[in-house]
Amino acid sequence: MTHCCSPCCQPTCCRTTCCRTTCWKPTTVTTCSSTPCCQPSCCVSSCCQPCCRPTCCQNTCCQPTCVTSCCQPSCCSTPCCQPTCCGSSCDQSSSCAPVYCRRTCYYPTTVCLPGCLNQSCGSNCCQPCCRPACCETTCFQPTCVSSCCQPFCC
């Protein structure tokens, strides 16, 4: 059946709780023929505005293009570059590519994720902090948050 999710929150089609707590944009979900409506294959474009559940983060928000535009501090139960979200090598310094430091963390050159080598991210890993995600999801340690994040950020 096509267009069974417009609006998305029809219980017989998409499962109301899925549409409301995961996809958030009911009107943008138009199909759910073979898979549950709120799986990434159905809601990948709308699931991240905002992304409010770990399942959304794990399945769709780890792509740099998605992370930079939608992931909120309260989105994931664990940071988006941890193994449960982005792969088993994400938090290992030996294989943490610059992309995780520069794209996933929102900041082009100055923010390091735990495990990322300083030479890949720059020496001032937490400065400046321009989004709440840096304070709450990326920087972890209070010493980092209190010493580098701007007041308007945290």
From Swiss-Prot:
Sequence repeats mapped onto the chain: 8-12, 13-17, 18-22, 37-41, 42-46, 51-55, 56-60, 61-65, 70-74, 75-79, 80-84, 85-89, 129-133, 134-138, 148-152
Region span, 15 X 5 AA repeats of C-C-[RQVGE]-[SPTN]-[TASPF]: 8-152
Entry annotated with the keyword Nuclease: no
Record's keyword annotation contains Repeat: yes
Keywords noted in UniProt: Keratin, Repeat
InterPro entries in UniProt: KAP
An example Gene Ontology CC term for this record: keratin filament
Domain of life: Eukaryota
Disulfide pairings: none
Protein's job: In the hair cortex, hair keratin intermediate filaments are embedded in an interfilamentous matrix, consisting of hair keratin-associated proteins (KRTAP), which are essential for the formation of a rigid and resistant hair shaft through their extensive disulfide bond cross-linking with abundant cysteine residues of hair keratins. The matrix proteins include the high-sulfur and high-glycine-tyrosine keratins.
Protein name according to UniProt: Keratin-associated protein 9-4
Organism: Homo sapiens (Human)
